[in-house]
Amino acid sequence: MPEEKIVCQNLGHVYPRGKIVALENVNLTICSQEIIGVIGQNGSGKTTLVKHFNGLLKPTSGKVIVEGNDTAKKKVQELAAHVGYVFQNPNHQLFAKTVEHELEFGPTNLGLSREEVEERREKAIEFFGLQDLRLSHPYRISFPLRKLVSMAAVYTMRPAVFILDEPTTGQDNITTRTVYRLIERLREEGSTVICVAHDMILLAEVVDRMIVMRNSHLIADASPREVFSDTELMHSTHITPPQITSIGLRWPGFGEKKVLLSVDEAVTAINSSNPPANS
């Protein structure tokens, strides 16, 4: 049975400056080995929501429970062992002189032995394919690779939950596909992954559930297929489904409306609706 990792109970948050209501009455449960997508327009509350998961923000009302810990009673440093946050811009996260040193910082702060620190560093280098970059300065490598280093730095902390803020922003196609595979591998290792993203292809092809935010409220919690097929929801949130999904819903060649999430699904649908002629 899936283990509950994060539970939000009637969560509300008001920013003191300007008394802006950022979250209102959010109820949500996220379990082990789920891949979750969080979407919504700017200002909808999605970033405010996930910053409660690692204690960067504290509830104004309600509760957030992370692996049995009430976040209101825990310091950010304590929650870092449970939830790792990878920022959208790696420049806000990286500071060491080499990739190796960057990957050693987190586990060293956890008080691990030198042997354990080196073991975690080497595991991260292997997992993220950073062998040729270990002695490079993080700011002297490309932006896409820098984002992988920032993910690897969080990986060395071994959190149960990873929060990835726009993980494919600024990535080329090759590195984007690498990120997709890494997210799947994190799940295979037992992690829960939460992606705050505008990348609809990532959400369609990789995540299990989509959390849709609008005007400080959680308005939908469903599979990508259910969310992308809800035209009223898409319209009200000003979100555009992946192009292949829009084609499937509109193209009469399939014989019926198809909620397609990938090109592979489109190929299968086309082949099944147009069987080869008998020779």
Where are these regions (language model features)?
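A short, flexible loop at the N-terminus of ABC-type nucleotide-binding domains that lies
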Residues: P2-C8, H13-N25, K73-K75
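The feature captures the beta-strand-to-loop junction immediately N-terminal to the Walker
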Residues: I39-Q41
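Helix-to-loop junction immediately C-terminal to a conserved catalytic motif
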Residues: N54
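Conserved ABC transporter NBD signature motif
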Residues: G62-D70, L79
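Conserved ABC ATPase "signature" region
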Residues: E115-L133
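Catalytic Walker B motif of ABC-type/P-loop ATPase nucleotide-binding domains
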Residues: F162-D165
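Conserved ABC ATPase "signature" C-loop
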Residues: N215-S216
